[in-house]
């Protein structure tokens, strides 16, 4: 870094780097987290670190100026319960309804904005035997939810007949997914419906963690 005078300069930084910016903003799309793989949707931002000609080292490691997660991490742990476990059900798909799946990240300020319309995100399981817990997670855009909830649809197969279970998820953080937080939802699917335990929310450091029940759709 070259300093032309002795004035102190304030720095910001972001990750991952993108050379495709418009007015300092990069496009963003929701992505599933893959084990032991970096997720390009996990955007980090740091600001406020200073340096000068006399002290040229830029330090983003202290608590106040360290990198922070800008998006939300939403994790699902779905297991078979009474009437479903040991009955040869297969996991067909899961829908997350009414969410923004794309947006823009401002590399100068660290702010995030939604883009486009609300949509349904589908995760396909390709008829996986539903005998034990299935877990997966998505990096999601921080957002307010329509009517403060995200509807979940779970589709199981039994002897090639599809059974639909539904449940709403309402984040305790004012009905929205907040940036920098991890939300964990433990969902039990039973032949009478779905149970969701109380959500666990922690700074991502972490967000919600809850146990949920889903009702069978008639």
Predicted regions and their residues:
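Conserved small-residue
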Residues: 114-123
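Extended low-complexity, serine/threonine- and proline-enriched intrinsically disordered segments
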Residues: 86-115
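Residue-level recognition of well-ordered beta-strand positions that form the cores
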Residues: 14, 77-79, 95, 153-157, ...
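Extracellular low-complexity Ser/Thr/Asn/Gly-rich intrinsically disordered segments
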Residues: 16-18, 101, 105, 110, ...
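Short, low-hydrophobicity acidic/polar segments
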Residues: 1-90, 124, 128-136, 178, ...
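Extended serine/threonine-enriched, polar tracts that run as long, contiguous segments within proteins
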Residues: 126-172
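Intrinsically disordered, low-complexity repeat and linker tracts
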Residues: 177, 181-218
């Amino acid at each position: 870094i070259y300093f032309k005078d002795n004035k102190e300069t304030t720095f910001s930084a972001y990750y991952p780097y993108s050379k495709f910016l418009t007015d300092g903003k990069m496009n963003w799309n929701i992505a599933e987290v893959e084990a032991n793989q970096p997720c390009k949707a996990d955007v980090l931002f740091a600001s406020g670190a200073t340096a000068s000609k006399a002290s040229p080292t830029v330090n983003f490691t202290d608590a106040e100026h360290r990198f922070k997660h800008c998006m939300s991490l939403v994790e699902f742990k779905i297991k078979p319960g009474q009437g479903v476990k040991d009955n040869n059900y297969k996991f067909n798909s899961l829908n997350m309804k009414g969410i923004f799946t794309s947006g823009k990240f401002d590399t100068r300020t660290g702010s995030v904005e939604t883009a486009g319309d609300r949509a349904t995100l589908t995760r396909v399981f390709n008829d996986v035997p539903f005998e034990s817990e299935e877990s997966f997670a998505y990096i999601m855009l921080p957002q307010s939810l329509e009517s403060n909830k995200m509807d979940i649809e779970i589709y199981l197969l039994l002897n090639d007949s599809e059974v639909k279970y539904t449940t709403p998820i309402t984040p305790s953080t004012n009905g929205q997914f907040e940036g920098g937080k991890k939300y964990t939802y433990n969902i039990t699917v039973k032949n009478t419906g779905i149970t969701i335990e109380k959500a666990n929310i922690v700074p991502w450091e972490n967000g919600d963690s809850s146990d949920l029940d889903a009702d069978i759709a008639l």
